[in-house]
């Protein structure tokens, strides 16, 4: 675990080099992005880098504020560069995200950015998406019918449970998350669209065709994919 954390940090530190003075930065959510936000904040405090951050979760918002990064929103600014982690990345830079249950706002921010950079360790690089269960955010009233629909499509589906309280995980948007294990996903773009057409689905964790760069920390050093 410590090795992977070091590889995550390696990728995160490299991503900060892509940030220019004056940028509005999309701040992803998760353990790898945590390192990115901390280092970005250090450069703000110690080197005078001037940036603003658009957080994708309360977790990222609080960390940005603690790190000295000015927080803004999509209502006020366009995003120059978004930096986010991923649970899986295929050779075409399609992603599965949502392990942190923040994928809806992550997708909004990441897809609206002029440039979207993904930071991962080497364990997240896969030939084909699907080993990681696909997160699907649903409004609570639609939980059961959406679960049945996903199962009819061949998925094994679980309602994600919370570790901090009894009952299901509740997203920052007040919704539930279904983790749908489909196995190998042959056409990520088609699957992304199909899932989002199910009534009651808010967003799913496939990010097809929006990443511009992947920075991966590996045991042999940094690997850059474009």
From Swiss-Prot:
Superkingdom per UniProt: Archaea
Gene Ontology BP annotations: D-ribose metabolic process; pentose-phosphate shunt, non-oxidative branch
GO molecular-function terms, A-Z: ribose-5-phosphate isomerase activity
Span of the signal peptide: none
Top-rank EC class of the record's enzyme: isomerase
Pfam families in the cross-refs: Rib_5-P_isom_A
Transmembrane segments: none
Keyword Membrane: no
The EC number(s) this enzyme carries: 5.3.1.6
Catalytic center residues: 106 (proton acceptor)
Reaction catalysed by this enzyme: aldehydo-D-ribose 5-phosphate = D-ribulose 5-phosphate
Example of a GO cellular component annotation carried by this entry: cytosol
Binding site for substrate: 29-32, 84-87, 97-100, 124
CDD domains, per database record: RPI_A
Record has Nucleotide-binding as a keyword: no
InterPro entries, alphabetized: NagB/RpiA_transferase-like, Ribose5P_isomerase_typA_subgr, Ribose5P_isomerase_type_A
Pathways involved: Carbohydrate degradation; pentose phosphate pathway; D-ribose 5-phosphate from D-ribulose 5-phosphate (non-oxidative stage): step 1/1
Keywords: Isomerase
Summary of the function given for this chain in its UniProt record: Catalyzes the reversible conversion of ribose-5-phosphate to ribulose 5-phosphate.
Subunit structure: Homodimer.
Family: Belongs to the ribose 5-phosphate isomerase family.
UniProt-recorded name of the protein: Ribose-5-phosphate isomerase A
Lineage: Archaea, Methanobacteriati, Methanobacteriota, Methanomada group, Methanobacteria
């Amino acid at each position: 675990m410590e090795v992977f954390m070091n590889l995550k940090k390696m990728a995160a530190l490299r991503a900060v080099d892509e940030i220019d003075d004056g940028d509005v930065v999309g701040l992803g959510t998760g353990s790898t992005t945590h390192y990115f936000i901390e280092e970005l904040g250090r450069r703000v405090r110690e080197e005078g880098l001037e940036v603003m951050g658009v957080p994708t979760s309360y977790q990222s918002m609080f960390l940005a504020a603690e790190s000295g990064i000015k927080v803004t929103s999509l209502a006020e600014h366009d995003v120059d560069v978004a930096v986010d982690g991923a649970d899986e990345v295929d050779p075409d830079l399609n992603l599965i995200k949502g392990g942190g249950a923040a994928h809806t706002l992550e997708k909004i921010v990441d897809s609206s950015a002029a440039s979207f950079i993904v930071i991962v360790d080497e364990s997240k690089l896969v030939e084909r998406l699907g080993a990681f269960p696909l997160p699907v955010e649903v409004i609570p009233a639609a939980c059961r019918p959406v679960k049945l629909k996903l199962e009819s499509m061949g998925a094994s589906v679980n309602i994600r449970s919370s570790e901090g309280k009894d009952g299901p995980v509740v997203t920052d948007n007040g919704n539930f998350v279904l983790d749908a294990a489909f196995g190998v996903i042959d056409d990520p773009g088609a699957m992304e669209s199909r899932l989002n057409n199910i009534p009651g689905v808010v967003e799913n964790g496939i990010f097809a065709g929006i990443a511009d760069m992947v920075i991966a920390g590996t045991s042999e050093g940094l690997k850059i994919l474009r």
